[in-house]
């Protein structure tokens, strides 16, 4: 199995990346080093003497991390935002980043959540909200400004969804809250997303731990890469409320995870010409190709209502005639699959266990098999 390091983002639009190839010159600061990046290309970390760091993200924005009691340099570009240490009282509206704060032992840096308690599948986040240690402060597009200001929030970590609501971003900044936009969803390689833990390690003074956690996932992938391709074809999808099959475009990171695990998407060159990864298909068209897939992986993170093979078949009678259904090779994602950004190597390993048949001796953690089919 060959591992390929790729550049660009999910949409294939590499022109979006405006990270400077050279260190940014900042008056009064002496450049020290640029942090290594193995898979990620949507951020860069430049370090300067005196404990200063500059995190650049794909849209060209820079975030200067100023050490505690450090002075803010003069004449800084308007494209550079200031984050003063110690970092805390964070309003976290980028759900995928919670796993990174948690893995670093810095979950307590997050004070406000843009995700409701019932939508968290990371134990720390759910428990912290139950205990009142993390407060719900509204979704990214409708934050509770009064709560954020009254409780001293100075930093908001957002996903790129905030770009669809620029007025919210502007309002937060007007209130003195720096808005950090996480571009990990634009990483073309699955481990590129995981590598963003280095960004959060930089913010929280946990560089070494961040590197160790990333390398652990990278080593898992290296081990899988030494195994031969399984030759198994896979259909990854869910059924929408309107009865359509919703799968992923061929360049999507989930399909890349499937490929890295030794499988292949049953759909070749599937693209909708837009920035979204979701592809909606009429069931008849979907059935024509997906019926021959060796393995079905049902994305239960969306509907959350498939507990058995009968539940799945009840969504559309065509499913009963799928090869994978007849052979008992039907699996579901756990509801925590897409929040566990620091387990990407392990999730790819789970895919490999399924594709290789090794799951019989080593059950996967993030997927479960639906009972039914010829084998059961």
Show where each model-derived region lies.
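Bacterial Sec-exported substrate-binding components of ABC uptake systems
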Residues: 7-98, 209-236, 358-376
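A short, structured surface patch at a secondary-structure boundary
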Residues: 53-59, 63-151, 155-161
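Extracytoplasmic ligand-binding site segments that recognize negatively charged/polar headgroups
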Residues: 88, 96-98, 113-124, 164-167, ...
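Solvent-exposed, polar/charged alpha-helical surfaces in well-ordered, non-transmembrane soluble domains
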Residues: 88, 98-102, 146-150, 170, ...
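Structured C-terminal subdomain patch of bacterial secreted/periplasmic proteins
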Residues: 94, 187-212, 295-376
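Soluble non-cytosolic domains of exported or imported proteins
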Residues: 138-143, 159-166, 187-194, 207-211, ...
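Flexible, glycine-rich surface segments
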Residues: 219-307
């Amino acid at each position: 199995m060959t591992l390929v390091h790729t550049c660009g983002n999910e949409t294939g639009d590499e022109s979006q990346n405006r990270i400077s190839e050279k260190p940014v010159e900042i008056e009064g600061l002496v450049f020290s080093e640029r942090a290594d990046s193995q898979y990620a290309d949507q951020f860069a970390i430049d370090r300067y003497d005196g404990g200063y760091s500059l995190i650049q993200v794909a849209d060209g924005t820079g975030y200067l991390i100023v050490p505690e009691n450090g002075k803010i340099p003069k004449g800084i570009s308007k494209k550079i935002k200031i984050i003063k240490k110690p970092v805390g009282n964070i309003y976290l509206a980028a759900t995928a980043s919670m796993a990174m704060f948690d893995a670093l032992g810095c979950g307590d840096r997050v004070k406000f959540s843009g995700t409701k308690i019932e939508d968290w599948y990371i134990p720390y986040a759910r428990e912290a909200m139950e205990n009142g240690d993390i407060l719900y402060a509204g979704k990214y597009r409708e934050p509770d400004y009064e709560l954020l200001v009254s409780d001293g929030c100075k930093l908001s970590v957002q996903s790129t969804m905030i770009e669809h609501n620029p007025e919210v971003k502007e309002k937060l900044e007007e209130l003195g809250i720096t808005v950090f936009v996480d571009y990990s969803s634009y990483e073309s390689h699955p481990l590129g997303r995981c590598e963003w833990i280095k960004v959060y390690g930089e913010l929280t003074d946990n560089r070494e731990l961040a590197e160790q956690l990333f390398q652990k996932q990278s080593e898992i992938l290296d081990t899988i890469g030494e195994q031969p391709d399984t030759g198994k074809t896979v259909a990854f999808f869910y059924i929408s409320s309107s009865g359509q099959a919703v799968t992923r475009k061929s360049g999507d990171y989930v399909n890349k995870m499937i490929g890295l695990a030794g499988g292949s998407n049953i759909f070749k060159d599937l693209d909708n010409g837009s920035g979204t990864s979701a592809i909606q298909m009429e069931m008849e068209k979907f059935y024509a190709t997906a019926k021959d897939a060796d393995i079905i992986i049902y994305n239960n993170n969306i509907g959350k209502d498939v507990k058995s093979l009968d539940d799945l078949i009840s969504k559309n009678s065509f499913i009963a005639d799928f090869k994978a259904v007849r052979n008992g090779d039907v699996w579901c994602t756990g509801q925590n699959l897409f929040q566990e950004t620091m387990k990407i190597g392990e999730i790819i390993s789970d895919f490999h266990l399924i594709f290789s048949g090794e799951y019989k001796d080593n059950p996967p953690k993030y997927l479960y098999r639906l009972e039914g089919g010829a084998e059961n």
